[in-house]
Amino acid sequence: MASDLRPPEHQVAGHRASADKLGPLVDGEGLFYKPLQAGERGEHEAAFYAAFTAHPAVPPRVRGAFFPRFHGTRFLPAPASPGGAPYPHIVLDDLLAGLPSPCVADVKIGACTWPPRSPDPYVAKCLAKDRETTSALLGFRVSGVRVVDARGGAVWRPDRSELKGIDAAGVRRVLRRYVSTGGGDGLDCALAAAVYGGEGGVLAQLRELKAWFEEQTLYHFYSASILFGYDANAAAAAAPGGGSGGVRVKLVDFAHVDDGDGVIDHNFLGGLCSLIKFIGDIVAEVTEKASSDHS
């Protein structure tokens, strides 16, 4: 099995695995292996997954629909680890397995990305990044994106420095480009109805997730991300009415989750509402244009 492990081809955020750097791996059989982060963060994330998976107050629908399935931890050969010793990895479902031409977006949620009781240097580092990106302004930032053009197979994948410098208008362009085919100005939003709209689309799933966050007081999800995934060919072939059924919306990255202590996670909820507004505006715009084209 170890010989089949490789860095995910479609990774858009985080550290990429190499001979001298630890990073996530996939096995081609539907599993994703995430090396434990250094210090307490990795152990904290593994403990969160174990507790969350068994928590009786988490609705099974929420756990199954919006969180990766947890398969425990496993030591894997890791040349990049100290002394080349086997290194512990969290084992999860590969969220993009089964998508031949995956289009991915990683959106970090929350205007504040550090948990309470964080050391001052870490707070300063997070605060600087939140202010120089759209996190502080919008309550979320796009950390990575990859779009495959279903017609020709060309891949659009802006680098991190490009995403880091965008403003609210830039976020709107990226979210539009994520559901465009690349024709014309590259912002035709031709796949918006299939990906963002409809019963199984991103917008409907985000609204369902929002309903849970309006009630849940178990956890506060600092620096967690929402991952969108869809297959370019399936979306292009979907009916224009929207909702191809293959769109995936998942929460990831839980190294900084804190106890909710009976309080709503307003930081995450606020960012989620902001993201819903941006995507809802795109769906409304596309719907209005389709109506005017047929009138």
Curated annotation (Swiss-Prot):
Q: Which UniProt keywords apply?
A: ATP-binding, Kinase, Nucleotide-binding, Transferase
- Where, by tissue, is this protein expressed? Highly expressed in anthers and at lower levels in roots, leaves, flowers and embryos.
Location of the region described as Disordered in the Swiss-Prot/TrEMBL record? 1-21
Taxonomic superkingdom? Eukaryota
The catalytic activity, as recorded, is: 1D-myo-inositol 1,4,5-trisphosphate + 2 ATP = 1D-myo-inositol 1,3,4,5,6-pentakisphosphate + 2 ADP + 2 H(+); 1D-myo-inositol 1,3,4,6-tetrakisphosphate + ATP = 1D-myo-inositol 1,3,4,5,6-pentakisphosphate + ADP + H(+)
Q: Name one GO molecular function term.
A: inositol tetrakisphosphate kinase activity
| Example of a GO biological process term | inositol phosphate biosynthetic process
Q: Which GO terms describe its cellular component?
A: cytoplasm; nucleus
Q: Which E.C. number(s) belong to this protein?
A: 2.7.1.140, 2.7.1.151
Q: What class of enzyme is it?
A: transferase
**In which family does this protein belong, per the annotation?**
Belongs to the inositol phosphokinase (IPK) family.
What is the annotated role of this protein in its UniProt record? Inositol phosphate kinase with a broad substrate specificity.
Spell out the protein name for this chain: Inositol polyphosphate multikinase IPK2
Q: Which organism does this sequence originate in?
A: Oryza sativa subsp. japonica (Rice)
**Gene assigned in the entry:** IPK2
